[in-house]
Amino acid sequence: MSNSRTADMAGRFCDEDFGIHLICGVLSVVVTGTGYEPVDAARLSDVLADRFVSIRADHPLRVAVDGPRAASPIALARNLLEPLRARGRVAEIIDAETFWRDASLRYEWGRTDLEAFAYHWLDADALRREVLSPLGPGGSSRFLPALRDPATNRSVRAAPIPVPPNAIVLIAGELLLGRGLPFDYTVHLAVDSGARQRLTPPEWQWTLPAHDSYDRTVRPAELADIVVRYNDPRHPAMRIGQPDQISPDNQQSMR
């Protein structure tokens, strides 16, 4: 699978998405939006926890914490556990990397194929089947916490976890939006292209064009219910929509 192949985030990347034109001239929707307010970094988890517990649902709340590796969405999700539990909620985390496909499938076109990384590393069907559908309306409220150890590529053979209807389950990872997954609420950690380049570990720099394309075509900062501008985690800013009951199926679709 060649990185020069054209497709958009519905299945075709543009040629320039992986080349110098986009890297040098990407339009960063995450830094030009309006309605952002500074938030004390020490209070960010409390602000988000208050928001989540205000949402009314008759099943466990399925919250996506989406962001590039540079923003460490899994770290923010872990920081949310204590404040959510202090507010009387059962809270659990799923690291989206534990729902990656087997390495033989991820690396079928090479270890650094951008199209594969963007579309085929995450087993979205398994995430839907084992987590999101069971936690949704009419589901069993039992979910699989992990499918595979991403470091060893071995199945973790985890047992399903039962949770009460008022539980909050956080699914944290990269490139989660725009897949039609039935999240009830979504948070996007927005990091612009320059900051991503500075903050992404060297071994993951090859993935940066996929995030540039994600910003440009999926526009996660427009899809998410909450956007946290996270170029500097010490000085975040937040844009939040109005508190409301969740929609019957708050899905974002690839366009």
Identify the residue ranges that each predicted region occupies:
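Conserved NTP phosphate-binding and transfer environment spanning the P-loop NTPase/kinase superfamily
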Residues: G19-A42, L176-R255
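Post-Walker A helix-loop "phosphate-sensing" segment adjacent to the P-loop in P-loop NTPases
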Residues: E82-E92
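Low-acidity, Ser/Thr- and Arg-rich intrinsically disordered low-complexity segments
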Residues: M1-R5, R12
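Pre-Walker A adenine-sensing motif
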Residues: S45-R56
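Glycine-rich phosphate-binding P-loop
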Residues: A64-E82
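Conserved nucleotide-sensing/catalytic segment adjacent to the nucleotide-binding pocket
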Residues: E92-D95, W100-T152
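Hydrophobic beta-strand scaffold positions of dinucleotide-using enzymes
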Residues: L170-I171, V187
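Loop/turn-to-beta-strand initiation segments
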Residues: P165-V169
